[in-house]
Each structure stands twice: as structure tokens, then as C-alpha cells.
């Protein structure tokens, strides 16, 4: 399965699986207005998901909450949707039971929680090419 491929080959990208496609279709079935959002994400000329250096957005010498990252991304006409903590990037959920164990990827984090980011961490954003 995809999870095993990621672990064995140390793949450092997102994989679009049947589970994600099923989730998208279920969301559109419940709310037709979401179709436009997903269309923007999935057409070649639409916005894309990028992992960009956290240092492009904030100074990492202090604790930062996600709200600050959202505002910083907004100034660049991007939408912050999460972040990746590099120190957890090689840890899968099979190895430990922890929210940070998803290869360091945190999507839709609590905006008021403060995090100590390192220079190696990334912000996950929606942005036009």
C-alpha cells in the first residue's frame, strides 16, 4: 500500500490515494459549493499545495502560533493549511502513537497553539504556480 511505499523508499511527497478521492467526492455530495474549491485545486492551471521554508514567513527564534503563519501567508497571497516539522519527517504513525507521527505533517492545526519551529521546518500553503 502507499504507506508502505513511503516508508520503504523514504518518499518525501504527498500521494493522492483512493481514500482522498473518496473523501473529496463525499464532501462534494454533501455540499455542492465545494466542487468549485476542489476544481481549483485539481485543474492544472489552479492553485497547488506547496511545502515552503517556514523562514519565508516568520522568524523562528521565538514560539509562533498558526494564526501568525496564516497572516504571513496571506500577505504573500497564499493560504496556509498546515506545517511540517522536519524532526518528525521520518516517523510514521506505525512507529509511535502521536499527532506528530504523520511524517511531521500537521494539517489544520489549532491556531492558538504555540510551536517552536526550526529553520528546517516547512509551511504547507495553497498558492498559484
Task: Briefly describe each language-model feature range.
Residues 1-129:
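Cytosolic regulatory regions of ion transport systems
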Amino acid at each position: 500500500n502507499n504507506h508502505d511505499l513511503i516508508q520503504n523508499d523514504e518518499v518525501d511527497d504527498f500521494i493522492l490515494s483512493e481514500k482522498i478521492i473518496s473523501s473529496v467526492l463525499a464532501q462534494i455530495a454533501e455540499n455542492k459549493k465545494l466542487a468549485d474549491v476542489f476544481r481549483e485545486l485539481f485543474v492544472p492551471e489552479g492553485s497547488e499545495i506547496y511545502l515552503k521554508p517556514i523562514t519565508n514567513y516568520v522568524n523562528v527564534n521565538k514560539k509562533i502560533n498558526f494564526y501568525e503563519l496564516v497572516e504571513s501567508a496571506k500577505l504573500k497571497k497564499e493560504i496556509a493549511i498546515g506545517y511540517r516539522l522536519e524532526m518528525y519527517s521520518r516517523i510514521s504513525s506505525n512507529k509511535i502513537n502521536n499527532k506528530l507521527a504523520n511524517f511531521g505533517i500537521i494539517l489544520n492545526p489549532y491556531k492558538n497553539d504555540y510551536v517552536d519551529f526550526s529553520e528546517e521546518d516547512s509551511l504547507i500553503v495553497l498558492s498559484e504556480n
